[in-house]
Amino acid sequence: HYGHKNDPIPAMKKVAGNPHGVLLLGDSVAARLHPALASTLEEHQHPMTFDHWNGRPTHAAADALVAIDAANAQPRTLVIVSGENDIFEPALFPVQIERIMRTAGPERHIYWVTPLVRRAANPTADENASTRLHGMLTEAATRHPNLHLVPWADKIRAANDATRTSLVPDGVHPSPEGVKVMASMILDTITSTNL
């Protein structure tokens, strides 16, 4: 697939063998986040492996996780950045959340960055779809105590226009400053659950 990047399975298995290992799974936002998150996590003794693909909807991320799990290469901790490409068919999102949670199992911790899409051309429709996805993730988190939401969407919604533009210039993809903020929020959420 165009833009699909991932560690080979042996490298994933090495990270999976470390109790503090983390898998970054997601879409083009995950690809942007990757360097900042890897360095942030590694500073705190969390080695990271990855599988991301520009334009990937959550069903394809779930497919990738099933394959990683089948290869016994799934770490104890997952960071998921997915949903931005589900705004066109939000009704399909809950099934994919459940596939990911079932594949991860109850012993792993899943940190899902809440998606926010707010493109200049369609701000109202994008915001409505993003809000639906957020509600679906929030509902899933009430049923899965090991699903932790990283409140990226809330942070961007609460920001003033200048801050929002500096963190997410196109309404979807974080800037270099934005990825640092997102990486820090992910680490804070992981740390708050004592991993």
Region spans (language model):
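A short helix->loop->beta-strand "cap" motif at the edges of active sites that frequently abuts
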Residues: 105-109
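Conserved beta-strand termini and adjacent loop/short-helix elements that scaffold enzyme active sites
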Residues: 51-53, 113, 150-155
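Alpha/beta-hydrolase-fold catalytic nucleophile elbow
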Residues: 81, 113-114
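Catalytic His-Asp segment of secreted/periplasmic serine-dependent ester chemistry enzymes
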Residues: 121-195
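Membrane/wall-proximal cationic-aromatic binding patches
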Residues: 1-20
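Conserved SGNH/GDSL esterase-like catalytic core that processes O-acyl groups on lipids
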Residues: 15-99, 119-122, 128-131
